[in-house]
């Protein structure tokens, strides 16, 4: 998932993300760059549309088995370890 996350993190309005598996599907958990969202004066609906555009753009860059089938936005930054890596285990069972 790290390769997919690196690509997703480079897309517009993404501050950080985490890719998890839900059944057979990959789901992106995304913390948007709210500073950029506010600068662009985007509504929640426009933010959702941009994230869907990001999902489609990402899926065009990766193999079919790496494609993201959905995403969920997180308002808060993900919890991190002292080394600043995301505590993945906290989000493994995230509801989509």
Label each region the model flagged.
Residues 1-7, 36-46, 63-68, 85:
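Adenylate-forming
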Residues 21, 33-38, 76-80:
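A short, flexible beta-alpha/helix-coil linker loop
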Residues 10-34, 59-60:
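C-terminal boundary motif of the adenylate-forming
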Residues 16, 24, 55-96:
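Conserved C-terminal "lid"/linker of ANL adenylate-forming enzymes
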Residues 6, 12, 82:
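Short alpha-helical basic/polar micro-motif
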Residues 34-41, 92-96:
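Short alpha-helical interface patches
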Residues 44-55:
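Well-ordered, non-membrane alpha-helical segments in soluble/globular domains
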